[in-house]
């Protein structure tokens, strides 16, 4: 999950015709659409795309946070610590690319997390940096222990994880224990916010608990779980309009909710995601988290499931506020099918699995209905506000586009991956391949992958000159794993998962293994 703002200025937008500036699949690019492709050749093509993005980042942007893949410049939106490198680590490990893994490990050992000139997001830093390092540690100390010969390089991952958490933990020093998100780590200050968001507060427990379990220092788990406690027992009771579904903002001073706006959209999403994932991580300690997820899932099926009038066969999730349903959704929200599938298979609930597959199909429709084969940043099925130019799209597809951007988000491919792993049905791998191929077609540049301004323009519109680090962590990983061999980190049907993925797709070893 990532906050819904695109965070893209006009200066980051390169106005260029992709057909002219970036011919699709020149002589150096793999052809991805051959009907004779085997599972192995698809896996190899995805690995090649990952290496293409890494090579461009290494040449033009490393050790900065991200590549600007149109201008071949760089950005430091994540504090200048090398976000793309740390986010790429677990994917490079899973792909068994020892060269890239060692390059990243060498970099991690040099990071000084106590120094930055920009505001630090507790949430983003936790899911990208802390999650990335802990995942690399768990993989390289566990099922991929043969990849790196120098064990001290691996040990640095845990040392640096602790160093980072020690820099960040003052965020929780509030009257309630609900943390500030936007931090000045130099002064020990914050932005003075009165509230924190549901997802920002509720997407910390997995990484901080894992750090405690690995180090034996319970401080980190205690801090994150204290913050979570207010979400698990929401006050006032009016903040929970349906069982398990809670408001969007929490007062930092007293831990009380300040609203009862309910959704699975950006800003709320990964709170629900982590409820069931904490149970997968340790069912003995986190039974309450599971109970709250089950309540939320049942309420979602009953109260938020929505079917467009033009396509009643489709299922999307509405939002809810004071008796009114909001008939709009986001690319970010499309993780929801994967969450229902994970919960359904772990808890042996076929109703959750079937509903999850319905959500996956709805999100597939947002990809399958555009000219690029990539889904939009946001969309709606509210018939009171359909633009005349999109009436035909709504009649055919069941939605219309409210923001046509694509910034390399992973959530649709992520849910396709869960559908494949839970059902074993080849359809979902085909959907992953189609989505990955579309990204490779329309987003690929000479040095990496760029975002698009309009997924329903024949050429994807213009280019956003930014390559988010989650391209490495999520899009490439979920795509690759669908065509890779079974392994300890892969999602398993039933309750046999040895790893669980954080919201940035970094797999951490579950507590009991």
Curated annotation (Swiss-Prot):
Keyword Phosphoprotein attributed: no
Enzyme class per UniProt: hydrolase
A Pfam entry, by short name: Glyco_hydro_47
Record keywords, A-Z: Carbohydrate metabolism, Cytoplasmic vesicle, Disulfide bond, Glycoprotein, Glycosidase, Hydrolase, Metal-binding, Signal
Entry EC no(s): 3.2.1.113
Glycosites: 97, 117, 150, 184, 251, 322, 348, 368
Subcellular locations according to the entry: Cytoplasmic vesicle lumen
Cofactor: Ca(2+); Mg(2+)
Signal peptide residue numbers: 1-21
Pathway terms, separated by semicolons: Protein modification; protein glycosylation
Disulfide bonds: 334-363
GO cellular component terms, A-Z: cytoplasmic vesicle lumen; endoplasmic reticulum; membrane
Entry keyword Protein transport: no
A biological-process GO annotation: protein glycosylation
Catalytic center residues: 377 (proton donor)
Reactions catalysed according to its record: N(4)-(alpha-D-Man-(1->2)-alpha-D-Man-(1->2)-alpha-D-Man-(1->3)-[alpha-D-Man-(1->2)-alpha-D-Man-(1->3)-[alpha-D-Man-(1->2)-alpha-D-Man-(1->6)]-alpha-D-Man-(1->6)]-beta-D-Man-(1->4)-beta-D-GlcNAc-(1->4)-beta-D-GlcNAc)-L-asparaginyl-[protein] (N-glucan mannose isomer 9A1,2,3B1,2,3) + 4 H2O = N(4)-(alpha-D-Man-(1->3)-[alpha-D-Man-(1->3)-[alpha-D-Man-(1->6)]-alpha-D-Man-(1->6)]-beta-D-Man-(1->4)-beta-D-GlcNAc-(1->4)-beta-D-GlcNAc)-L-asparaginyl-[protein] (N-glucan mannose isomer 5A1,2) + 4 beta-D-mannose; N(4)-(alpha-D-Man-(1->2)-alpha-D-Man-(1->2)-alpha-D-Man-(1->3)-[alpha-D-Man-(1->3)-[alpha-D-Man-(1->2)-alpha-D-Man-(1->6)]-alpha-D-Man-(1->6)]-beta-D-Man-(1->4)-beta-D-GlcNAc-(1->4)-beta-D-GlcNAc)-L-asparaginyl-[protein] (N-glucan mannose isomer 8A1,2,3B1,3) + 3 H2O = N(4)-(alpha-D-Man-(1->3)-[alpha-D-Man-(1->3)-[alpha-D-Man-(1->6)]-alpha-D-Man-(1->6)]-beta-D-Man-(1->4)-beta-D-GlcNAc-(1->4)-beta-D-GlcNAc)-L-asparaginyl-[protein] (N-glucan mannose isomer 5A1,2) + 3 beta-D-mannose
Cofactor binding mode and count: Ca(2+). Can also use Mg(2+), but with lower efficiency.
Function recorded in the entry: Involved in the maturation of Asn-linked oligosaccharides. Progressively trims alpha-1,2-linked mannose residues from Man(9)GlcNAc(2) to produce Man(5)GlcNAc(2).
Subunit structure: Monomer.
Name of the protein in its database record: Mannosyl-oligosaccharide alpha-1,2-mannosidase 1B
């Amino acid at each position: 999950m990532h906050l819904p703002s695109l965070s893209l200025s006009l200066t980051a937008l390169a106005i260029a015709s992709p057909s002219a500036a970036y011919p699709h699949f020149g002589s150096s690019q793999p052809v991805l659409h051959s009907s004779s492709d085997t599972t192995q050749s698809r896996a190899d093509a995805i690995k090649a795309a990952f290496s293409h993005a890494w090579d461009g980042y290494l040449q033009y942007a490393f050790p900065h946070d991200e590549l600007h893949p149109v201008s071949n410049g760089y950005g430091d939106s994540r504090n200048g610590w090398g976000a793309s490198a740390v986010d790429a680590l677990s994917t490079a490990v899973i792909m068994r690319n020892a060269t890239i893994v060692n390059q990243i490990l060498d970099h991690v050992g040099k990071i000084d997390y106590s120094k930055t000139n920009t505001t630090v997001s507790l949430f983003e830093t936790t899911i990208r940096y802390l999650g990335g390092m802990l995942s690399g540690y768990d993989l390289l100390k566990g099922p991929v222990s043969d990849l790196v010969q120098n064990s001290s390089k691996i040990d640095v991952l845990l040392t640096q994880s602790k160093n980072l958490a020690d820099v960040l933990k003052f965020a929780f020093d509030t009257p309630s224990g609900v943390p500030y998100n936007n931090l000045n780590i130099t002064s020990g200050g914050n932005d003075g916010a009165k509230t924190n968001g549901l997802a920002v507060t509720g997407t910390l427990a997995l990484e901080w608990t894992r750090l405690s379990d690995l180090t034996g220092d319970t401080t980190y788990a205690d801090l994150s779980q204290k913050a979570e406690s207010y979400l698990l027992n929401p006050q006032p009771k009016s903040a929970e309009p349906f069982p398990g579904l809670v408001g969007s903002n929490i007062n930092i001073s007293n831990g009380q909710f300040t609203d009862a706006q309910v959704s699975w959209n950006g800003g709320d999403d990964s709170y629900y995601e982590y409820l069931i994932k904490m149970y997968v991580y340790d069912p003995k300690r986190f039974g309450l988290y599971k109970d709250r997820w089950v309540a939320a899932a049942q309420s979602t099926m009953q109260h938020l499931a929505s079917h467009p009038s033009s396509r009643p066969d489709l299922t999307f999730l509405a939002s809810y506020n004071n008796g009114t349903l909001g008939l709009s959704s986001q690319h970010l929200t499309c993780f929801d099918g994967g969450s229902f599938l994970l919960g359904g298979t772990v808890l042996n609930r076929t109703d959750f699995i079937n509903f999850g597959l319905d959500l996956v199909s709805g999100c597939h429709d947002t990809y399958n209905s555009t000219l690029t084969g990539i889904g939009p940043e946001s969309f709606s099925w509210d018939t009171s506000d359909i633009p005349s130019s999109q009436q035909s799209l709504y009649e055919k597809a069941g939605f219309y586009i409210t923001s046509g951007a694509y910034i390399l988000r992973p959530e649709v491919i992520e849910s396709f991956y869960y559908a494949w792993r839970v059902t074993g049905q080849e359809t979902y791998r085909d959907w992953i391949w189609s989505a990955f191929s579309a990204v490779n077609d329309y987003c690929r540049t000479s040095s990496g992958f760029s975002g698009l301004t309009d997924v329903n323009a024949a050429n994807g519109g213009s280019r956003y000159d930014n390559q988010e680090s989650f391209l490495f962590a999520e899009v490439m990983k979920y795509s690759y794993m669908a065509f890779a061999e079974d392994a300890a980190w892969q999602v398993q049907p039933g309750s046999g998962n040895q790893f669980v993925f954080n919201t940035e797709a970094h797999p951490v070893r579950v507590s009991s293994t």
